[in-house]
């Protein structure tokens, strides 16, 4: 009996360890990609790092040799200390953790593999898609039935994102396409304290940090996590969603260097440090209503992060199928977020072809009236599920 207790304790310690390492890797990837995606004073950013890393996890499952090593290093698993042999189990356990404790918020995750009808998957890979990713298999004809294949993929995308994203692909894919790996996530969170629609008024927002415009702005005095770091001229806010499992973190840099310089100095460690500074305060919040819709071809961005092997002729994806040589042509990502008085709805699809101590003080003010960064995160696992940058409204 003593041996059994020791064994159980050991298993818990190991599981908790690689669970934390997976989170660290994913959050580093989130911040790295936020810095790497192209932006401008007129262009906003919004994406789901969790969706992208999950879709790429299905590629990882079929990679071999140098291609596997490149993915292992490029997605930060090596740097976070997650052993290569633990990665797939960590994906499965991590997904389960994100579903624990959901109450008032909705967080749905779905995976699928659209497979050319004549492509024979290796049984081990098919088993991994099922057991690790719970992926649905869609048999399609990319050669002769291109439009029908696209329609089936887009129907899946629309259903799994609760109609927030109509389609992932607008036109036919290359007839050489043999496999499209898909991940879709949907989040709906209701603010812990809702804003009053009647209090929403036009207020000034500085597009690009310089050009004033009038936008619908929600206002209310509410308890949120808040901290002003005067030396950095940075305001940090954490707005909770009902149930306490999710929150939106806002970073509002007021310094003269602007949001781009601030963003490029940001690291996952600094972000977590900023969030750790917030204290529960009564704050008069002014937050613009906004809706962002984005679409990315991530091939170049992933290459800039060192993920290169899967895109070249040297790619070794022989763990997927023995039928010919497979390479990844692109990684496509679409995301939508809408923030209003009720809360937040966000969806994303990827295809691979702190509440601290309560302090009673006078009301503070948070006026989000210029470009800012925001993150939607799971407050228990600390995962960054969505990330964005609002420059222009």
From Swiss-Prot:
**Name of this protein:** Iripin-5
Keyword set, alphabetical order: Complement system impairing toxin, Glycoprotein, Immunity, Protease inhibitor, Secreted, Serine protease inhibitor, Signal, Toxin
Gene3D superfamilies hit by this protein: Alpha-1-antitrypsin, domain 1, Antithrombin, subunit I, domain 2
Q: Which GO terms describe its biological process?
A: immune system process
State the similarity comment.
Belongs to the serpin family.
Give a Gene Ontology cellular component term annotated to this protein. extracellular space
Q: Which residues are glycosylated?
A: 198, 245
Q: Which CDD domains match?
A: serpinJ_IRS-2-like
Q: Which domain of life is it from?
A: Eukaryota
Asked whether the keyword Plastid is assigned, the reply is: no
| Biological function | Serine protease inhibitor that modulates blood feeding of ticks on vertebrate species. Inhibits host neutrophil elastase (ELANE) and proteinase 3/myeloblastin (PRTN3). Moderately inhibits host chymase, cathepsin G (CTSG), trypsin and alpha-chymotrypsin. Decreases host neutrophil migration. Decreases nitric oxide production by host macrophages. Decreases host complement activity.
InterPro entries hit by this protein: Serpin_CS, Serpin_dom, Serpin_fam, Serpin_sf, Serpin_sf_1, Serpin_sf_2
Q: Where expressed (tissues)? A: Highly expressed in female salivary gland during blood feeding. Expressed in female midgut and ovary during blood feeding.
Q: Which SUPFAM superfamilies match?
A: Serpins (SSF56574)
Supply one GO molecular-function term: toxin activity
Q: Where does the record locate the signal sequence feature?
A: 1-16
Q: Where does this one sit in the cell?
A: Secreted
Is Glycoprotein among this UniProt entry's keywords?
yes
Inducing stimuli: Induced by blood feeding.
